[in-house]
Amino acid sequence: MELDFPLAAPASDTAMPKGEAVSIFRAQCVSRHIDIVSRKMHKSGDAFYTIGSSGHENMASVAKAVSRNDLAFLHYRDAAFQIMRAMDSSACTPIRDLLLSFSCSKEDPISGGRHKVLGSKELNISPQTSTIASHLPKAVGAAFSIGLPKSKIRFSNVKEQPIVLCSFGDASSNHSTAQGA
């Protein structure tokens, strides 16, 4: 097949380390499986929040592409990102945490059972609920704060100059909160 446009040659230093594709795939599978389990839990009366992350599994690749020091403000369906980051940390239990969140357990480390929330201080992921675009102004503020003197930055576990990653869905792009950010 002939193309109407030239393709750039791949960069020579883009080889993925051995095993990395498998770890990304594992995070994607865990994200999808948690969605299936949450729906079963809802059907049996053991879960109360079933808006899952199906269709957003490739956010695991994004998590692998950025530094753990980078601050993340995630779309509420981007559990694969959090799962991927947590897989590299022995201090996090992403599967347990998400299941606690779906079941509105008071043991949920992020919301204490009030809502299904993605987020983790350990993983530099700001807590985010399903409110459309509400995290965009926070992301802009965090990005602005990076340029402030270190004494004013409140991100305790950020060791290097981070970037701020913010993901959002199509409904957010036309929301006034997004436009304001």
Which ranges hold each PLM region?
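Cofactor-/ligand-binding subdomain signature composed of acidic, glycine-rich
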Residues: 1-47, 69, 96
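Cofactor-binding active-site loop characterized by glycine-rich and histidine/acidic residues
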Residues: 33-36, 43-181
